[in-house]
Design a protein with these regions (language model features):
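N-terminal Rossmann-like dinucleotide-binding module
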Residues: 1-47, 51
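N-terminal glycine-/serine-/threonine-rich beta1-alpha1-beta2 phosphate-ribose binding loop
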Residues: 30-84
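Donor/substrate-binding cores of folate-linked one-carbon enzymes
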Residues: 29, 42, 88, 92-205
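Short amphipathic alpha-helical segments
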Residues: 18-21, 51-53, 101-104, 123-124
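Short, basic/aromatic-enriched C-terminal tail that caps enzymatic domains
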Residues: 199-218
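A general structural signal for well-ordered alpha-helical segments in protein cores
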Residues: 16-17, 48-49, 74, 127, ...
Length: 218
């Protein structure tokens, strides 16, 4: 049982759309024993909502602008999530910073994907920053969510070469291909019980993963 939270127009938004479109009677990609119970966005015009609705998945909008504090917003978000009793919360471009109370509540059962090779380029505008820094490699990272922004324990990373003529848009498109590959893999591992967070360390099949997680080879 998973819940997807898309927000805003970001590259991760396409992931939420891909998840919703690939569901057949609630089963992701036909190979993961899981169902999406609810898709939540904080923006009413989020494309992921329409895609989820088309796939027959329940949706809900919780507008953060209607709340007087981050704590109040997170409390309502928690109520909506817990009503479905999910095993896993999947963030897909949800561009809000959570309170420590929220991240603690879902410790070990909330995943996020970030368009950089963490710990490099946390936050926004990662592709522009990668080009400006003249790095040789860029990519995407799947990690468990913690109270530190884009700083939770690493699960899986995929890299791409940064080419001399790359624009941020071109580089983002190449990274997005890798995002589409590695996020479903990480979700599948979690749903199969192979991927766990224990004492703030990531275990895969009972074995401790390196600090940078598994390096994906396509």
């Amino acid at each position: 049982r998973a819940r997807v939270t898309p927000s805003g127009v970001t590259t991760e938004f396409h992931l939420a759309n891909a998840f919703a479109e690939s569901y057949d009677a609630g089963n992701i990609m036909g190979s993961i024993e899981a169902t999406i119970e609810l898709v939540i966005s904080n923006k009413v015009d989020a494309l992921g909502l329409a895609r989820a609705h088309k796939a027959g998945i329940e949706t809900r909008v919780i507008n953060h602008l209607e709340f007087g504090s981050r704590e109040a917003f997170d409390k309502e978000l928690t109520h909506a999530i817990d009503d479905k009793q999910p095993d896993l919360v999947v963030l897909a471009g949800f561009m809000r910073i959570f309170t420590p109370q929220f991240t603690h509540h879902y410790h070990g059962r909330m995943l996020n994907i970030h368009p950089s090779l963490l710990p490099k380029f946390k936050g926004i505008n990662t592709h522009e920053r990668a080009i400006e820094a003249e790095v040789a490699e860029h990519g995407a990272s799947v990690h468990f969510v913690s109270s530190e922004l884009d700083g939770g324990p690493m699960v899986l990373q995929a890299s791409v070469s940064v080419l001399s003529l790359d624009s941020p848009k071109v580089l983002a498109a190449r990274v997005l291909v890798q995002e589409h590959l590695i996020y479903p893999i990480a979700i599948k591992w979690f749903c199969e019980g192979r991927l766990k967070l224990q004492n703030n360390a990531v275990l895969m099949d009972g074995q401790l993963l390196p600090e940078q997680g598994i390096q994906f080879q396509s």
